[in-house]
A protein has these predicted regions:
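Oxidative protein folding and maturation machinery
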Residues: 1-100
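Short, internal strand/loop/helix patches
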Residues: 6, 88-93, 157-199
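Conserved redox-active cysteine motifs that mediate thiol-disulfide chemistry
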Residues: 106-107, 113-131
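Active-site acidic short loop of glycosyltransferases
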Residues: 106-108, 139, 165, 188
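Alpha/beta-hydrolase fold active-site loops
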Residues: 109-110, 192
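Short beta-strand segments
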Residues: 113, 144-148, 172
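Structural microenvironment flanking redox-active thiols in thiol-disulfide oxidoreductases
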Residues: 124-163, 177-183
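Thiol-/selenol-based redox modules, centered on thioredoxin-like
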Residues: 196-237
């Protein structure tokens, strides 16, 4: 019995009537949407089956319709951000106003860090981020790009750059923060978020390991560089 199916059946045993419907609806609206965002795509048929089975027990059809809509969005997001898909291009400026496009980094492995000056977890990652950048300082084939989603350029510079001195190339997503084109195209729903893109502009990992993962992210970058050096034909042998 699938853990979620077991969970649902247990809830049905210990709750009744209106309370049961409320609890089941709550799980569908929260846990299920989360699964479609973070769990393996291969597991989607299982969750589809559970949604079909237990969704019928939700008395309010609007809840089920809204949940299905959210899930459809997540499925689409996962499809276009899957490994091998082209990463969305961007045109963003650094603190001096010089603009950069993802295409400018063609041929290089790109580690993208979406962050904000007000984000505690983002700041907590900086010591390890600096170590990661330093580890690959002699490798010209990798570049570290941080994109701030601070609402204003002033906040980004004064509270972010000047205060914390983050490493790598520092860019600003532009006005709007969460509503900026970058945030929308990269589906930034929380920060920090890290992404790894190969030299052809294709996604390696849209939810790459954090700098604090240590060897995990170090090995991921090293593997990407190795593939670039040996060429794709080598890995098809």
């Amino acid at each position: 019995l699938n853990p979620y199916a077991f969970h649902f059946e247990e809830i049905k045993k210990i709750t009744k009537g209106k309370l049961q419907k409320i609890v089941l609806a709550s799980i569908l609206q929260s846990d299920f949407v989360y699964n479609y965002e973070y769990e393996p795509v291969a597991d989607f048929p299982v969750y589809d089956s559970l949604l079909e089975r237990y969704g019928k027990e939700i008395p309010n059809p609007e809840v089920l319709v809204a949940t299905r809509s959210k899930i459809d969005i997540k499925k689409h997001q996962r499809a276009i951000t899957a490994t091998g898909q082209p990463a969305p291009d961007f045109l963003l400026a650094d603190s001096s106003g010089k603009t950069y496009s993802l295409k400018d980094f063609a041929g290089k492995t790109v580690y993208i860090d979406a962050w904000a000056s007000w984000c505690g977890p983002c700041i907590a990652e900086l010591p390890d981020y600096k170590k990661l950048v330093d580890k690959f300082k002699d490798r010209q084939a990798v570049i570290f790009v941080s994109v701030s989603i601070d609402d204003t350029k002033t906040a980004w510079i004064e509270k972010g750059l000047n205060k914390h001195h983050p490493p790598g190339l520092q860019l600003w997503a532009g006005k709007g923060g969460w509503r900026s084109t970058f945030a929308k195209n990269y589906y930034i729903s929380g920060v920090p978020q890290y992404m790894l893109v190969d030299g052809e502009g294709k996604i390696i990992d849209f939810n790459a390991p954090r700098p604090s993962s240590g060897e995990k992210i170090g090995n991921a970058i090293a593997e990407a560089l190795k593939k670039k050096e040996l060429g794709p034909a080598y890995f098809k042998m």
